[in-house]
């Protein structure tokens, strides 16, 4: 059967509408159906439409380091609690990468990840600086003359600076106290302090290392463990309503009983574009990463986390 001939008989407007309702994974596969489908997917109006629809449903991007590899997954972020204290969602698997030798220095912005020390086998095993799009499985290597111009770490923020302090408290049982210090007026150095008590005996145990990993555009504070075990939980705290919602994420390396360091990227927006290649620098390579089987980023707050035990 000639797939290209059959697809060309379908009205272009109908193909456009069908593709626009799909997630990024099948769309990237359908580029191979025919030249017509590829041309539609690469059209600027299509990529912009896809990005706008994805922006209304941001996801939680999860990076798991195990066996010398980054494994990327994503899951839906709860938009509204609707009175539910717990949810179960499925994770989508995206791509694998060799482990960055200095994983603490990664950066995230506009759906792209920057790694300063990635080893790629088909580049003479040299350690290189890489920018990748985990949704489309594309990556680009920074040219040598540009690699020294960027620091190994950095965050973007636009309006308010926030410091979140997470404390343990054993008064009458295990609980977490969340202290938020928000810079309301930069020139006057006016800070506002908010204190919240979090408790979920069924999901958070006294030996769990729970950290603040970010804040969503809707204002929810995201908490998670730095090393995850089955079941895999992420927690969303709404400061306005003082509600804590636990979300069990299924499909994250379920063949393993446990895995190593986990990193989280809040408000990830799937994007078909890889415009950083055109606007920032001339890339030496763009290719899908090998595999075995977007706000674009949170720009409203710069969040630092501190975790300590009370004496």
UniProtKB/Swiss-Prot annotation:
Q: Where is the F-box domain?
A: 4-53
Q: Membrane-spanning residues where? A: none
- Gene3D superfamilies (UniProt xref): 1.20.1280.50
* Pfam families, sorted: F-box (PF00646), FBA_3 (PF08268)
Q: This protein's superkingdom? A: Eukaryota
Q: Which SUPFAM superfamilies match?
A: F-box domain
Q: Which InterPro entries match?
A: F-box-assoc_dom_typ3 (IPR013187), F-box-like_dom_sf (IPR036047), F-box_dom (IPR001810)
Region Disordered, as annotated, extends over 287-311
- Entry-linked PANTHER family: BNAA05G37150D PROTEIN-RELATED, F-BOX ASSOCIATED UBIQUITINATION EFFECTOR FAMILY PROTEIN
Protein's recorded name: Putative F-box protein At1g31090
Organism in which the protein naturally occurs: Arabidopsis thaliana
């Amino acid at each position: 059967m000639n797939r290209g001939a059959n697809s060309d008989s379908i009205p272009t407007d109908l193909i456009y509408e069908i593709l626009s309702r799909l997630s990024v994974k099948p769309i990237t596969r359908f580029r191979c159906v025919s030249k017509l489908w590829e041309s539609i997917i690469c059209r600027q109006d299509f990529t912009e439409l896809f990005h706008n629809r994805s922006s209304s449903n941001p996801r939680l991007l999860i990076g798991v380091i195990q066996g010398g590899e980054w494994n990327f997954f994503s899951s839906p972020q709860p938009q509204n609690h609707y009175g539910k204290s717990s949810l179960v969602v499925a994770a989508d698997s995206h791509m694998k990468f060799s482990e960055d030798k200095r994983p603490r220095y990664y950066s995230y912005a506009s759906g792209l990840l920057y790694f300063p020390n990635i080893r790629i086998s088909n580049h003479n095993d040299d350690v290189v600086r890489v920018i990748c799009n985990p949704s489309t499985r594309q990556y680009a290597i920074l040219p040598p003359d540009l690699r020294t111009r960027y620091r190994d770490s950095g965050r973007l923020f636009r309006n308010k600076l926030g410091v979140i302090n997470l404390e343990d408290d054993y008064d009458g049982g295990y609980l977490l106290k969340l202290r938020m210090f928000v810079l309301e007026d930069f020139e006057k150095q006016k800070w506002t302090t908010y204190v919240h008590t979090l408790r979920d005996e069924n999901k958070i145990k006294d030996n769990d290392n729970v950290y603040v990993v970010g804040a969503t555009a809707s204002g929810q504070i995201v908490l998670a463990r730095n090393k995850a075990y089955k079941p895999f939980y992420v927690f969303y705290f709404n400061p306005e309503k003082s509600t804590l919602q636990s979300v069990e994420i299924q499909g994250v390396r379920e063949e393993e009983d446990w895995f190593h360091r986990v990193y989280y990227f809040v408000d990830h927006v799937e994007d078909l574009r890889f415009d950083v290649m055109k606007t920032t620098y001339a890339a030496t390579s763009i290719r899908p990463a090998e595999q075995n089987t977007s706000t674009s980023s949170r720009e409203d707050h710069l969040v630092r986390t501190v975790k300590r035990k009370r004496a």
